Amino acid sequence: MIDFHCSKRHKDMTPIVKDTDIQEYAETLLRDYKPKLLQEPGKVNPIHFVEAYLDAVVDYQDIYYPDDEPAIAGATLFNDDHILVFDREAKRIKPIEVAANTVLIDNSTMADGKEGFATFTVLHEGGHLCLHPAVYRRMGGQLSLFDSHKDGDSVVCCRRSSLEGGGSKRAKLTTQTDFREHQANVFAASIAMPRSTFTPAAQEMIRNCGFRDGVFVMPDVMDWDYSLGVSAIEESLSSLFGVSKAAANVQMKRLGLLMTEEQYLVQHRQFAVAF
């Protein structure tokens, strides 16, 4: 595994980086792990990547969360610690010991029909392991902050709503927790859908829909034909890369392959000024 380095951090040690920095780092890992994934479209095995390459352990539990809080999709532990789970047999909540460098995936995330979201969740937690040890890992002698749920705790619990494909619209990034979740999302997308294979695959599908420059432009007014066209592309990319349609949609937007008319016109005006 190749360590992540950045020159600028927030006072809580959250990396201050651009999406492209994370994309390049993820692609460096893929080049070291399995170069073929950068050469032709395919599905990464998220469990093998996290366990064999990142040297972590993946486990599955019914992670406890209060009824009035969003569901947890996964968690990452940077130190030996305890986490609350729901014991279905005893029908009670109990703490369990979990070793450092463990990725916990909630059993609901692994339900049939959610394979794409499960892949993204495992890789998202792998992103935290790679990008955020300086934030969460405690050195010897430090007290556990697990029960206080403060930033800097050695356990990061990721809400389903914070993951791409988790069913919520992208929120504004305001807190350092928001930025870390976003960074883990970018990492997961870059491992599952690297630019070198995702972009040409998506552009071929987009051109087949009549967009010669390989950018799918959605009209500012709702149009069912365009929506169905995008949905078909998302479905194909989802099948090709083993991700959810929602994750494929976000990656298309992130890479400038899916835009609104207004976004497209603004970009082309910028190009015209530049040249």
Please describe what each predicted stretch is.
Residues 1-275:
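Active-site hotspot residues in diverse enzymes, especially metal/ion-binding acidic/histidine motifs
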